[in-house]
Structures are given as structure tokens and as C-alpha cells.
From Swiss-Prot:
Its cofactor is FMN. The keyword Translocase applies. The lineage of its organism: Bacteria, Pseudomonadati, Pseudomonadota, Gammaproteobacteria, Enterobacterales. The complex is composed of six subunits: RsxA, RsxB, RsxC, RsxD, RsxE and RsxG. This is Ion-translocating oxidoreductase complex subunit D. Belongs to the NqrB/RnfD family.
């Protein structure tokens, strides 16, 4: 009889990294479908560009480091990084922007630290922030949802705008961004912040076409609900834990409610915060990154709550309309400290 001697751990989780990443990619399908429906084919083009760029960038670095290219690419982490960045940027952003952001995310924010499992910051959000700071105009040029859009670009038009800046008929981004009221549209969060600073009342702002949705912003409410559906499926599959999404959303809702009660003329209502921007995408797909989030249950609650507070502060008082990316990166910085003070006590040892 032959006995096999193996080192610990002796109990293994059968779900490999590649399977977890694949589950997250599958869970993103409802959110992607919603963005395609409300914002057009540009989202699909950006996803394809980001995916190819992520795989090529990762393969190049692995080749230079003389590591197995095929084995590493099979973990699907590069694909997920590209996907998260692609759905975070405007659908008709120039092609070179998503390529630049993805390459930066994979090479600088991930591989430079040693690859998957070593990076302290979420790579997709690093790429997003680099693009936002470097090209703020292009990164905030979102199309109006098709419900209130005048010009809805088709698949060919989307490709032409992304690669040349113009449609076949000569239309550009300024034309495509016009809403049914003839005014260039922005996201619900951007519209609210800009209008408040211009001295408009909340009652006036809520009459804008972008807020014609049942719950929050037109189109955006359904996009967020679609990402929420994908997130709930991830929880059901036990691919992520509930601590971070719950604490993030509860904290954001509480802060928004308190702010709205104390200053209803300058601060957005809770439903605007919860169902606009990247709220649900951030709660279930970005903050839950196991590499850059806290590793203890108490730590996850603190981590999520901190991110929720930061999102509300940035949206309400900062210079950017949506603070999810900045909140994620700032929360990432605190992870070592959070884990240090929330680590479980070793059995048989006194606390401290």
C-alpha cells in the first residue's frame, strides 16, 4: 500500500481562482445587457477592446518575466480587469483611452506588484482614475439613455465614433449627447452637482429629463438594478460574501438620508445615490475583490462602511460626480490597518 504524504492545508476549496473569476464574469451579464440597451453598442466595443488589451498586456509581462503565459491567462483575472474598466467608462470614449487604461491597470497596477494576489489596489479602478484625471472631458461624456436621447447610434456608428470621433453622417459626440430637450445630457449625479452649483433648486432639477425614471435617473436606475441582480446571484453562488456590499449600501443610504434631511436643497436623495452611477457595480463587483479588500468579517464590514461614507462625501462635496473609484482606492489603503485591528484572537492567547 502506498501512502501519499501532503503538506497542509488538508481541506481544500474546490473553487479555483479561474472558476471564481468566471462566475463574476457571468454575473456581469445582466449589467452589461442593461448598459447595451440604454447606452448602445459602444459598451460592447469597449469590452472587446479592453479584453484583448488586458490579455496581450498580461501575456507580454509574463513573457518578459519568463513565467507560464497560458497557465496565468487561464485564471481569467486579466479579462475581469478589462471588463470592469470597460463598463466604467463612457461607451463612445476614444479607442485609445480604454487601451491605455487597461494596459496601465494590468502592467502597472497588477503585474508590477507581482501579479494576482500581490496588488494592494484594485487594478481596474487604478486604470479608471488615471484616465479620469488625465482626460476628464472624455471620461465624463456619457450618452443620454435611449429613453431621452435624440440620436441613438447603431453598431456601425458606435465603431466609427470610437475609432474616428464621427459617425458616417458627420455627427460627433456633441450631437449624440443631445437629449429630447435639446440640451447636452450628463449622468444624474453630474447633472445634480452641476445644477446645484448653478443655483438651481432641487425641485427644478428633478424636472429634468434625466430624472424621468420611476425610482431615480432614467436608464441608470435599471442599469444599477441589473448589476444588483448579478450581485445577488454571486451571493447565492457564494462567490462573494455579504459583509462588504451590505455595509457599503447601508452606510451610503444612511449618509444620503441624513444629508438629504438636513439639506434637501443641496444634497441628493438616497435613491439617487443608490441607483445612479456605479453604486451597485462597486458594491458587488469592485469592492468585493478578495485581493484588495479586508480579509476578516469585522474588517469587511468596516471596509464597506468606509467606502460608503467616502462615496457619499465625494459625491456631495468633492469635485467629481461619482466617487466610487476614489472611494475604493482610499479604502484599499486602509486594509492592512483594518486587518491588523480586526484579526481574530489566537486560541489560548489573551487579547493584546
Amino acid at each position: 500500500m502506498v501512502f501519499r504524504i501532503a503538506s497542509s492545508p488538508y481541506t481544500h476549496n474546490q473553487r479555483q481562482t479561474s472558476r471564481i473569476m468566471l462566475l463574476v464574469l457571468l454575473a456581469a451579464v445582466p449589467g452589461i445587457a442593461a448598459q447595451l440597451w440604454f447606452f448602445g453598442w459602444g459598451t460592447l466595443v469597449q469590452i472587446l477592446l479592453a479584453s484583448v488589451s488586458a490579455l496581450l498586456a498580461e501575456a507580454l509581462v509574463l513573457k518578459l518575466r519568463k513565467q507560464s503565459v497560458a497557465a496565468t491567462l487561464k485564471d481569467n483575472s486579466a479579462l475581469l480587469t478589462g471588463l470592469l474598466l470597460a463598463v466604467s467608462i463612457p461607451p463612445l470614449a476614444p479607442w485609445w483611452m480604454v487601451v491605455l487604461g487597461t494596459v496601465f491597470a494590468v502592467i502597472i497596477a497588477k503585474q508590477l506588484y507581482g501579479g494576482l494576489g500581490q496588488n494592494p489596489f484594485n487594478p481596474a479602478m487604478i486604470g479608471y482614475v488615471v484616465l479620469l484625471i488625465s482626460f476628464p472631458v472624455q471620461m465624463t461624456s456619457w450618452l443620454p439613455p435611449h429613453e431621452i436621447a435624440v440620436n441613438i447610434p447603431g453598431f456601425i456608428d458606435a465603431i466609427q465614433v470610437i475609432f474616428s470621433g464621427h459617425t458616417a453622417s458627420g455627427g460627433d459626440m456633441n450631437t449624440l449627447r443631445l437629449g429630447i430637450d435639446g440640451i447636452s445630457q450628463a449622468t444624474p449625479l453630474d447633472t445634480f452637482k452641476t445644477s446645484v452649483r448653478a443655483g438651481h433648486s432641487v425641485e427644478q432639477i428633478m424636472q429634468y429629463p434625466i430624472y424621468s425614471g420611476i425610482l431615480a435617473g432614467a436608464g441608470w436606475q435599471w442599469v444599477n438594478l441589473a448589476w444588483l441582480a448579478g450581485g445577488v446571484w454571486l451571493l447565492w453562488q457564494k462567490a462573494i460574501r455579504w459583509h462588504i456590499p451590505l455595509s457599503f449600501l447601508v452606510t451610503l443610504a444612511l449618509c444620503a438620508m441624513l444629508g438629504w434631511l438636513f439639506s434637501p436643497e443641496t444634497l441628493a436623495a438616497p435613491q439617487i445615490h443608490l441607483l445612479s452611477g456605479a453604486t451597485m457595480l462597486g458594491a458587488f463587483f469592485i469592492l468585493t475583490d478578495p485581493v484588495t479588500a479586508s480579509t476578516t468579517n469585522r474588517g469587511r464590514l468596516i471596509f464597506g462602511a468606509l467606502a460608503g461614507l467616502l462615496v457619499w462625501l465625494i459625491r456631495s462635496f468633492g469635485g467629481y460626480p461619482d466617487g466610487v473609484a476614489f472611494a475604493v482606492l482610499l479604502a484599499n489603503i486602509t486594509v492592512p490597518l483594518i486587518d491588523y485591528y480586526t484579526r481574530p484572537r489566537v486560541y489560548g492567547h489573551r487579547k493584546g
